Design a protein with these regions (language model features):
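Hydrophobic anchor at the beta1->P-loop junction of P-loop NTPases
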Residues: 8
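Small-molecule kinase domains that catalyze NTP-dependent phosphoryl transfer to phosphate-bearing small molecules
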Residues: 128-192
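ATP-dependent small-molecule kinase phosphotransfer cores
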Residues: 36-92
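P-loop (Walker A) phosphate-binding loop of NTP-binding proteins
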Residues: 11
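ATP-binding Walker
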Residues: 14
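Conserved phosphate-donor/acceptor-positioning beta-strand/loop module used by diverse small-molecule
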Residues: 85-89, 102-125
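Post-Walker A helix-loop "phosphate-sensing" segment adjacent to the P-loop in P-loop NTPases
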Residues: 25-33
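Walker A/P-loop
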Residues: 17
Length: 192
């Protein structure tokens, strides 16, 4: 694509990672892999570039930055110029909108999912990663509580959002991905 960078924002369990992966696979879009000081959760984990605190401190030209659970995450300007999509949280969006001075037009896509759908996805995901049912419930409820404050402006429709896409359990993933791609295509043709 090329003229825009699409910032993908959504609460935990909203499906933002799955949707982004589908946009990459089906339409050939490229996604930024954040630099992070977090350790990989499992061998072969993708979606991030895992580096030490010392390596992170040497990064320059950051255009997005956030911290979560004691770990730092960022993207640098060169990554934006070479990619189409970036999964990012609200703090990262705020940083990006102030720091990014490149040629691409930023567009914010908010993936909205109801609480029940998000909860069921998070519990299921935690259980498949080895947590007991009780641990999965507790970690999911903690994330939901954290998201309620972190994403408040997005949930209430008070944040600057260019496009909202609903992704609930009764929605077909393929239809959602196609709708988002249609939006992306229309933005790219507007910016040319």
């Amino acid at each position: 694509m090329g003229n825009c960078i699409f910032l993908i924002v959504g609460c935990s369990g909203s499906g933002k990672t799955t949707i982004t992966e589908q946009l990459e696979q089906k339409y050939g879009l490229k996604s930024i892999q954040s630099y992070t000081t977090r350790k990989p959760r499992y061998d072969g984990e993708t979606g991030h570039i895992f580096i030490s605190d010392e390596e992170f401190d040497k990064l320059t030209d950051m255009v997005a930055y956030t911290e979560f659970a004691g770990n730092r995450y960022c993207a640098i300007a060169e990554q934006v110029e070479n990619n189409d999509l970036y999964i990012i949280d609200p703090k990262g969006v705020d940083f990006f909108m102030k720091a990014y001075k490149g040629s691409k037009t930023p567009k914010i896509i908010f993936i909205s999912s109801n609480l029940t759908t998000r909860y069921e996805r998070m519990v299921g995901r935690a259980e498949t990663k080895g947590k007991s049912h009780q641990e999965a419930i507790e970690s999911s409820l903690t994330r939901i509580a954290n998201d309620a404050s972190e994403f408040y402006d997005y949930i209430q429709g008070q944040a600057w959002i260019d496009y909202v896409c609903k992704n609930n359990s009764n929605d077909k993933l393929e239809d959602i991905v196609d709708k988002i791609f249609d939006y992306i295509s229309s933005c790219e043709s507007e910016v040319r």
